[in-house]
C-alpha cells in the first residue's frame, strides 16, 4: 500500500511539476524543434518526402496524434492483459 501511494505521488508530481517549472513557457512539439535545428545546420536543405495527408488545422492534427497514441496503448494493454489472464489460467490448472 505504501509503495503504491509513493508511486502515485511520483506520477502526480511528474505531471504537475512541468507547469510550475516552465511557467508561461510554450510547449512546442519535436517536429518544430527539429525543423529549426535543420534550418540552422543546413539552410538550403529541401525535404525529400511530403506527408500523405496534411490535416486542415492544428486541432485535427492533435486529435489524430491522440487517437494514434490511444490505439497504441489499447493494443499494448490488451496484449498485457491477455498474457496475464493466460498466466493465471495456467497457474490454476
From Swiss-Prot:
Domain of life: Bacteria
Record's keyword annotation contains Ion transport: yes
Lipid bilayer topology: Multi-pass membrane protein
A single Gene Ontology CC term: plasma membrane
GO biological process: cobalamin biosynthetic process
Pathway: Cofactor biosynthesis; adenosylcobalamin biosynthesis
Subcellular localization(s) per the UniProt record: Cell inner membrane
GO molecular function annotations of the record: cobalt ion transmembrane transporter activity
Keywords from the UniProt entry: Cell inner membrane, Cell membrane, Cobalamin biosynthesis, Cobalt, Cobalt transport, Ion transport, Membrane, Transmembrane, Transmembrane helix, Transport
Family matches, as InterPro entries: CbiN (IPR003705)
Chief location bin: membrane
Chain ranges passing through the membrane: 5-25, 63-83
Subunit structure: Forms an energy-coupling factor (ECF) transporter complex composed of an ATP-binding protein (A component, CbiO), a transmembrane protein (T component, CbiQ) and 2 possible substrate-capture proteins (S components, CbiM and CbiN) of unknown stoichimetry.
Family recorded in the similarity comment: Belongs to the CbiN family.
NCBIfam families for the chain: cbiN (TIGR01165), PRK02898.1 (NF002780)
Role: Part of the energy-coupling factor (ECF) transporter complex CbiMNOQ involved in cobalt import.
PANTHER family for this protein: COBALT TRANSPORT PROTEIN CBIN (PTHR38662:SF1)
HAMAP family named among the record's database cross-references: CbiN
Protein name listed in UniProt: Cobalt transport protein CbiN
Phylogenetic placement of the source organism: Bacteria, Pseudomonadati, Pseudomonadota, Gammaproteobacteria, Enterobacterales
Amino acid at each position: 500500500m505504501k509503495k503504491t501511494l509513493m508511486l502515485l505521488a511520483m506520477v502526480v508530481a511528474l505531471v504537475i511539476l512541468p507547469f510550475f517549472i516552465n511557467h508561461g513557457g510554450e510547449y512546442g512539439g519535436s517536429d518544430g524543434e527539429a525543423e529549426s535545428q535543420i534550418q540552422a545546420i543546413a539552410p538550403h536543405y529541401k525535404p525529400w518526402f511530403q506527408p500523405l495527408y496534411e490535416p486542415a488545422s492544428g486541432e485535427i492534427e492533435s486529435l489524430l496524434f491522440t487517437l494514434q497514441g490511444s490505439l497504441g496503448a489499447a493494443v499494448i494493454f490488451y496484449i498485457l492483459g491477455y498474457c496475464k489472464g493466460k498466466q493465471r489460467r495456467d497457474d490454476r490448472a
